[in-house]
UniProtKB/Swiss-Prot annotation:
Residues 4-20 are annotated as: 2 X 7 AA repeats of G-S-D-[LP]-K-H-A. PROSITE patterns: NNMT_PNMT_TEMT (PS01100), SAM_MT_NNMT_PNMT_TEMT (PS51681). S-adenosyl-L-methionine binds at Y46, Y51, G90, S91, Y96, D112, N117, D169, V170, A192. GO terms for biological process: epinephrine biosynthetic process; methylation. Pathway: Catecholamine biosynthesis; (R)-adrenaline biosynthesis; (R)-adrenaline from (R)-noradrenaline: step 1/1. Disruption phenotype: In knockout (KO) mice, resting cardiovascular function, including blood pressure (BP), heart rate and cardiac output is the same as that in wild-type mice. Significant difference, however, is observed in the BP response to exercise. The relative diastolic wall thickness and the ratio of left ventricular posterior wall thickness (LVPW) to left ventricular internal dimension (LVID) are significantly increased in KO mice. Gene3D superfamilies: Vaccinia Virus protein VP39. This is Phenylethanolamine N-methyltransferase. Catalyzes the transmethylation of nonepinephrine (noradrenaline) to form epinephrine (adrenaline), using S-adenosyl-L-methionine as the methyl donor. Other substrates include phenylethanolamine, octopamine and normetanephrine. Keywords: Catecholamine biosynthesis, Methyltransferase, Repeat, S-adenosyl-L-methionine, Transferase.
Length: 295
């Protein structure tokens, strides 16, 4: 959602979460249950709940959508986060999280566990009829960045720089499988509302963070957006469990994962955006840099 429920993202590596779970004897019961629950995930319902008004109303600068776009734009405006290769971990059916990133990386990989989400991304990337309309988000990103770029140019650049949309399983030590179709290690990772949404407990959350960190070069950057103190969200017929995390638990997981936390911001979800599609309390945004030497 534009809040905690942006939890669009699922966990696994294949197109069939049930099959993926059955094929992995190391999956614990909690992770299997998460994978099975996501079989009922409905991308369009998720998008309506979180990216159409009221949460998708970007006219109020105090809204959650503008806040997330500002967080991303401000980090990229520093010039410190750039390179060639960026991986978006658990993209779900959304693209807004890459609108500011795409000017700084020429090779972008989007990923998701669910085939339905990868298909939804494909509709937008190919400009097919019926694709979700992200133009309001693209316009707002251009407004924030204030570089004189049109929203059409912004979207054209993002489409050109997304080179592949792949399955991922953040619960596997090699989340993208082997051999990887992505040039590794990446210079940066982006992940929005993924890890907490697919982890049955805090230990799984921390382990998933460790797994994706293996994809990132030492000195590389992670930009992480997620839900605070959320335990469930809706995506159509699916009611999906979330591991509730606090700001301090996020910080601790990043430090334990070998990161220097450059910035950690929080957004408290206002009452008018609490619409009954989840129980999210707030959103966090973390900018973290992978230590050159892992402790």
């Amino acid at each position: 959602m534009n809040g905690g429920s942006d939890l669009k993202h699922a966990t696994g590596s294949g197109s069939d979460p049930k099959h993926a779970a059955e094929m992995d004897p190391d999956s614990d019961a909690g992770q299997v249950a998460v994978a099975l629950a996501y079989q009922r995930f409905e991308p369009r319902a998720y998008l309506r709940n979180n990216y159409a008004p009221p949460r998708g109303d970007l006219s109020n600068p105090d809204g959650v959508g503008p806040w997330k776009l500002r967080c991303m734009a401000q980090v990229f405006a520093t010039g410190e986060v750039s390179g060639r290769v960026l991986i978006d971990i658990g993209s779900g059916p959304t693209i807004y999280q890459l609108l500011s990133a795409c000017a700084h990386f020429e090779d972008i990989t989007m990923t998701d566990f669910l085939e339905v989400n990868r298909q939804e991304l494909g509709l937008w990337l190919r400009e097919e009829p019926g694709a979700f309309d992200w133009s309001v988000y693209s316009q707002h990103a251009c407004l924030i960045e204030d570089k004189g770029e049109s929203w059409q140019e912004k979207e054209r650049q993002l489409r050109a720089r997304v080179k592949r949309v792949l399955p991922i399983d953040v619960h596997k030590p090699q989340p993208l499988g082997t051999p990887s179709l992505v040039p590794l290690p990446a210079d940066a990772l982006v992940s929005a509302f993924c890890l907490e949404a697919v982890s049955p407990d805090l230990t799984s959350f921390q382990r998933a963070l460790h797994h994706i960190t293996t994809l990132l070069r030492p000195g590389g950057h992670l930009l992480l957006i997620g839900a605070l103190e959320e335990s469930w969200y809706l995506a159509g017929e699916a009611r999906l469990s979330v591991v509730p995390v606090s700001e301090e638990e996020v910080r601790e997981a990043l430090v334990l994962g070998g990161y220097e936390v450059r910035e950690l911001r929080t957004y408290i979800m206002p009452a008018h955006l609490c619409t009954g599609v989840d129980d999210v309390k707030g959103i966090f945004f973390a900018w973290a840099q992978k230590m050159e030497v892992q402790v």
